[in-house]
A protein has these predicted regions:
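Flexible "arm" and connector segments at domain edges
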Residues: 1-106
Length: 106
């Protein structure tokens, strides 16, 4: 037996059972769901950082979308927030690395 205690995609129980194994599943309440989504997004970021694979970014996007739904924020609303931040602060297109800040005389 392997213990997991992690949020999985909706079809994973069927995939496990199709492989001849059994699994125990718990349906989370809304508060638990957000907590486990937050853990999941960290997991997906780490998987992307380790592998560099675009497929991991797709997983990250899926978790991000689930968080938005759980927080009752539409993807369009989220995109407006993103664009507003780009308008005010820019994006990451110029590949700028801030090394230090200082005032005259420092």
């Amino acid at each position: 037996m392997i213990e997991y205690d992690k949020l999985v995609r909706d079809k994973i129980p069927e995939v496990i059972e199709a492989s001849g194994k059994k699994c125990d599943i718990e349906v989370l309440n809304d508060e638990q769901y957000i907590e486990y989504l937050n853990k999941k997004i960290k997991e997906e970021v780490n998987e992307y950082l380790e592998s560099g694979e675009i497929e991991e970014l797709a997983d990250l996007e899926e978790v991000l979308r689930a968080i938005l739904v759980a927080k009752k924020v539409s993807y369009d609303e989220f995109e407006k927030i993103r664009i507003s931040k780009v308008d005010k602060r820019g994006a990451f297109e110029k590949k700028l690395l801030l090394k230090r800040t200082y005032t005259d005389g420092e």
